[in-house]
Amino acid sequence: MPELKDYGLVLRSREYREADRLVTLLTKNNGLVAGVARGVRKVHSKLAAQIEPLTFGLYQFHLGRSALGTLLQAEALNHHRKLRSNPLLLAHAQYCCELCEASLPEHEPAGPVFTLLLQALTTLEAETEPARAAHCFELNLLALLGYRPVLASCLCCGGPGPYRFDPSCGGIVCRRCPASAEAFPVSGAAVSVMKRFLELGFYRLSVCRVPVAQCGEIHRVSRLLFAKAVGKTRFKSLEVLHSLTEWH
């Protein structure tokens, strides 16, 4: 049977059977890969520390006939300890990971998403406002999935604002043009921030000020677009974020 060796980031690790763990990774060249790490819950397992969530490393799997592979070797290159030691940073990082897992099929290359996620984690490690980095990640992930919001001008007439965001057409519509019942007002400031996120990504993100009200608008846009993209709006990591802070 074939083997797979690739750089990857551990998105999730959970107990499986008596002594194993089920590990889900986003890899550089093979997309989502899930496999069983056998015996890692036993004392002195060499693999246990290599498969903690948010660990980046080089992983080798044996691919059998089932959907799950078997983890053979792992070499951790970055444990992202700063993220894991801070509950708020950890929750934001887990949210980014959960979005990736929900958005991608298994074993289909997703190199740009892999790169984006690593950039997000690196940015979060230096962030004083982690929600800002998470919202930037949301929008750029949507763009890679083919759901980039149209923000240049009114989708219907090309005119100026004030605007509403209409999830049914994936962009902004001025108040003079018809929109669906899902449409909601979005401020010019929020539109400007979203355009900046999409144009520059994480570059000099620390100098981009995003007030709480605008964070709420941006997350609402992203949440509704993710509902269209993956059919899901509820994420466990969001519940953790809400318990830690007034996250928008």
Regions from the PLM with identified roles:
Residues M1-H248:
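Non-catalytic alpha-helical scaffolds and adjoining flexible linkers that form interface surfaces
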